[in-house]
């Protein structure tokens, strides 16, 4: 039974995904349909959570816009996601960065990972 499910899911996996983790700053290009037009909307922020495996894997991106924190959760293999760009690698020691929700301003920054 598992082999059947795995073979069906195989065709829906995205192959061109970059490697990223919590603390990384990413740009997510999302396809948005407005009426009959389809355009790309860019959501840039810090990855605070990655959960799940396989097709159901999701990641949450947080950004602060004019003092208001906005979090968006994206399915990793969704056809609505055109592409994901990693702009910065963050150095963190946690898998879930929920503590960033209470921090504002410069305190909410994540250190950049060394280039070695």
UniProtKB/Swiss-Prot annotation:
Which GO BP terms sit in this record?
translation
Q: Would you say which domain of life the source belongs to?
A: Bacteria
Provide one Gene Ontology cellular component: cytosolic large ribosomal subunit
Record-linked Pfam families: Ribosomal_L19
Q: What does this protein do?
A: This protein is located at the 30S-50S ribosomal subunit interface and may play a role in the structure and function of the aminoacyl-tRNA binding site.
Which PANTHER family does UniProt cross-reference here? LARGE RIBOSOMAL SUBUNIT PROTEIN BL19M, RIBOSOMAL PROTEIN L19
Its protein name is Large ribosomal subunit protein bL19
This protein's species is: Syntrophomonas wolfei subsp. wolfei (strain DSM 2245B / Goettingen)
